A protein has these predicted regions:
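Structural recognition of the beta-strand scaffold that forms the well-ordered cores
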Residues: 15-24, 82-85, 135, 140-141, ...
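Structural helix-adjacent loops and short alpha-helical linkers that scaffold large soluble proteins
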Residues: 29-43, 89-105, 147-162, 174, ...
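Extended ligand-binding groove/face enriched in aromatic
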Residues: 39-150, 154-158
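Flexible, glycine-rich surface segments
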Residues: 189-231, 237-238
Length: 328
């Protein structure tokens, strides 16, 4: 079929990235509640569906961006990293080997995306090795450090720290502690700043502090947290009630990933300023950002509305409510 014709036909199923958000959402619900019905949902529905994206025709095996019964699709390292983190969290929650084996399979794929160009780091896409992105390195550090917590293999701790240091050296904005989006092989930096880039670096720094006791990492995490709060929140005056710091309009899933970093840091330094702000935002969103079907818009002020709702946005909201419910 001609590519122009294909453009006119919508995908029958979700791409891997938004589908993976449902894994994160159900994982968070299960961890928050201990309700076995969520584990059943995860095993019998979410993960069964996820296997439709597993590509074993290329080596090493990894998850492709679209289902394996369609034409072969690209494989993105960051897509796989988010899955690896969730499988590792599921293992830490249960000690069931099936989750660990999946995490290890994904880690092998992630390692295949690293080389010495630019002094290290992981590419963004297996088929387009033209840039190394914060989104394929910062969460890879988180993934490695969680794997170390899971099985105490020191190689993961070493790799997690290496990825953290590489990303900090290559992609941090030294003027404000936030992170740029990517660096191309010619050294050109895309200076866009997204919540899902700085958030995992905050989380990785906090994990490194927890695992090493080195205060340098805690200071890093706190600097990133303050910078994120200043950049990704704005002063907001609601029609009723007191002014508060509102999350900027943008990708809600990016915000959910950033929240993971804030929660990790709060559980370490117990500064609740940022968590309180997230709670205010989520309470306000519940009252002002849902449509008649209960689905959320991306504008947390409630003043603009989306014509279409995205699976990943809804999954991100579930994840954030679940995580905040047990963050005391």
């Amino acid at each position: 079929m001609a590519s122009e014709e294909q453009k006119e036909i919508p995908n029958q199923y979700s791409y891997l990235w938004p589908y993976s958000g449902t894994f994160s959402a159900v994982n968070a619900l299960w961890a928050a509640t201990g309700d076995e019905s969520y584990k059943t949902l995860l095993d019998n529905k979410v993960l069964r569906g996820l296997e439709k994206y597993l590509d074993i025709s290329r080596s090493p095996a990894g998850y492709a961006s679209y289902i394996n019964t369609a034409s072969q699709s690209d494989r993105f390292y960051d897509d796989n990293i988010w899955l690896g983190i969730d499988f590792t969290d599921a293992y830490l929650n249960t000690k069931e080997e099936k989750y660990l084996k999946k995490a290890q399979l994904i880690w092998e794929f992630i390692e295949s995306g690293a080389d010495d160009k630019l002094g290290g780091g992981i590419y963004w896409c297996e088929q387009k090795k033209v840039s190394k992105n914060t989104c394929s390195n910062a969460p890879a550090s988180v993934f490695a450090l969680k794997m170390f917590k899971a099985i105490r293999d020191s190689s993961y701790l070493i790799k997690g720290q290496e990825l953290y240091e590489w990303t900090k050296k290559r992609l941090q904005d030294s003027t404000d502690y936030l992170y740029f989006d990517n660096i191309s092989l010619d050294g050109k930096i895309d200076k866009s700043k997204y919540a899902y880039n700085s958030g995992p670096m905050m989380q990785a720094a906090t994990l490194l502090y927890q695992l090493t006791g080195c205060s340098y990492f805690l200071k890093d995490a706190q600097n990133i947290a303050k910078a994120c709060y200043n950049y990704f929140f704005i002063n907001f005056i609601p029609e009723e009630g007191e002014p508060f710091k509102l999350l900027k309009k943008g990708d809600v899933w990016f915000t959910a990933v950033m929240l993971r970093g804030f929660i990790e840091l709060y559980q370490t330094d117990h500064n609740k300023t940022y968590i309180n702000s997230f709670n205010q935002n989520m309470d306000y969103a519940w009252e002002h950002v849902r449509d008649e079907k209960g689905l959320f818009d991306i504008d947390f002020s409630g003043r603009t509305h989306d014509d279409r709702k995205w699976l990943l946005t809804q999954a991100a909201m579930v994840e954030m409510y679940a995580r905040l419910a047990v963050t005391k």
